[in-house]
Amino acid sequence: MIGFGLHLELVALLRATRGGLHPDLLAAAHAAHLGGADHVVVPVRADRRRADERDARHLQESGVLPVHLEIAPTTENVAFATQLRPAGVVLVPEPAGDRPAGRGLDVASEAARITEAAGALADAGILVAISTDPDEAQLVAANGAGALAVELHAGRYAAAASEDARVHEFLALSRSAASARALGLRVHVGHGLDYGNVTRVAALPDVEVVRGGHAVIARAMFTGLHQAVAAMRERLVRAAAEEAPIP
């Protein structure tokens, strides 16, 4: 069955706007669990302005849901991850500002650094995923760097301004998912997915996990997080049960 991971960045961002303890990331994880999420994604950025090591430890120790860290492949981040030993780590570019990076890692040009990070994480028994654009060369580089999974960056698909452009980007995701599986990599997809555009992605037979945050948290403002996660989960399961994705 296709998995869903709830990205907690917007929950942490809302907390950071006023400081203090609310909204509580652990309460969000409990609601996500009730809604059927399989894990939560905790982004730990260089500035630690949103989520930080304390949040990750708190969530990990709670055991409510498996924790996947989202980090840049720096020495400091890798050292923390190997000490925490979450269920998984997604290696991503460090954002330049407040917005998430609009692309995956350029694994081909940063192979040495990423390979070192992936090796240390794998040695600690952590599932290592590398965020990449849907590009054959990047997939080959991620495989060579020691990734066990790739998280295909769906940003261009999600931001497509026309249906023709959307189909073009979807086909790129589809080809990349198949190529990644042929390389022996597990396939995750994330970034920019909402309740509408996720159905094509979830119907791809090679996709094992979908991750999302913004659309789910936005809906949660009106329905509650439990119900918002459940609605996304239902959408994924229904789409994955279809025989073939709509091109």
What are these regions (language model features)?
Residues 4-25, 66-73, 100-108, 122-134, ...:
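Active-site mouth loops of central-metabolism enzymes
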Residues 2-8, 40-42, 67-71, 89-91, ...:
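Hydrophobic faces of well-ordered beta-strands that scaffold small-molecule active sites
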Residues 74-85, 135-145, 189, 193-207:
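Catalytic cores of alpha/beta
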Residues 1-86, 141-143, 168:
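Conserved N-terminal beta1-alpha1 strand-loop-helix module at the mouth
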Residues 127-183:
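Histidine/lysine/aspartate-rich catalytic loop segments that bind and position anionic ligands
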Residues 90-98, 148-161, 205-225:
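Glycine-rich phosphate-binding active-site loops on the catalytic face of alpha/beta enzymes
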Residues 60, 103, 162, 166, ...:
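C-terminal helical cap(s) of enzyme catalytic domains, especially alpha/beta-barrels
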Residues 36-38, 62-65, 83-89, 123, ...:
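Glycine-enriched alpha-helix->loop->beta-strand junction motifs that scaffold or abut catalytic
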